[in-house]
Amino acid sequence: MDKLFDRLQMLEDRYEELGELLSDPDVISDTKRFTKLSKEMADLRETVEKYNKYKEVTQQISDDEEMLSDGLDDEMASLVKEELSNAKNEKVKLEEEIKILLLPKDPNDDKNIIMEIRGAAGGDEASLFAADLFSMYSKYAERQGWSIEVIDKNVTEVGGFKEIALIINGNSVWSKLKYESGAHRVQRIPVTESAGRVHTSTATVVVMPEEEDVEIELDPKDIRVDVYRSSGAGGQHINKTSSAVRMTHLPTGIVVAMQDQRSQQQNREKAMKILKARVYDYYAQQEQSEYDANRKSAVGTGDRSERIRTYNYPQNRVTDHRIGLSLNKLDRIMNGELEDVIDALVLFEQTKAMEKLENE
């Protein structure tokens, strides 16, 4: 803990320095710098407050132990012992809370996300499962007070999704749903199966942070834009203007097609939003940063084809293969009650990161 306390003292010193800087007229007049320093101070506030509380509790423990060593009457000794016990429990609790606050922050945690769900192996059944996953995430988002905007979808004849893309807006969406990328496997009896046999199908989920203040700038020369007429079921043209848009990022070969919006301009805006997110995600996947290494040691490789979870309908069981978690409440999870799964993934990653922090 000594190294952690050294770091905490440095953070407290910086917090006090920020307080002085934010009172400086020159800083106040510089809106950009003032905003940046205010955010830095706000980010440090909880950690510094916990550290100060920790120091108070540690001092109280020392004072109580000194009082007991001086000799007290039975009634007073009983009160001090109770106070000492409570203080020691609070100290342990504060230590764990402080460790979590000191863990490296994912810079994307506060961001909204773009999610893409695709039916994979399994034909019609895979597309139906993709629709079930969309329903599950939609209900979970509603439980969190988030909003969902469907920006593209390809509906199959059986009412499933060949693919669907959506934006989920809200408080810290990425921090909760970043673990969902990968292959999701379902085991169940399809409605079309007359013999009652269990079939296995898969759907893939890709989760990307929405890049509003885009850290990646796309050179217009690297983007080819094609426009065409939107098509309905069976390829029938549903309007007479070229409102559909296809964008190709030439360096990566990433293609985004958008036709669900009412105008070409709206389709352009949505296509560019998804293209930026996909290109950002593509390059992020290429980087061998320290953060990526931590992710791989924690909740999986991040490989889009990695099987991360199995949904077994006959046994009402959901298994997350990355952390060995099995829950016999598939019905509730598919109804949006994802908290137990996501909380377990967050805890697992925090535990791994904490072990690394303590060993540094």
Swiss-Prot record:
Single Gene Ontology MF annotation: translation release factor activity, codon specific
Entry-linked Gene3D superfamilies: 3.30.160.20, 3.30.70.1660, 6.10.140.1950
Modified residues (N5-methylglutamine): Q236
Keyword Protein biosynthesis: yes
SUPFAM superfamilies associated with the record: Release factor
GO annotation, cellular component aspect: cytoplasm
One Pfam family hit: PCRF
SMART domains: PCRF (SM00937)
Keywords tagged on the record: Cytoplasm, Methylation, Protein biosynthesis
Post-translational modification: Methylated by PrmC. Methylation increases the termination efficiency of RF1.
Localization in the cell: Cytoplasm
Domain of life per record: Bacteria
Role description: Peptide chain release factor 1 directs the termination of translation in response to the peptide chain termination codons UAG and UAA.
Annotated family: Belongs to the prokaryotic/mitochondrial release factor family.
HAMAP family registered for this protein in UniProt: Rel_fac_1
Protein name: Peptide chain release factor 1
Organism: Ligilactobacillus salivarius (strain UCC118)
Gene that encodes it: prfA
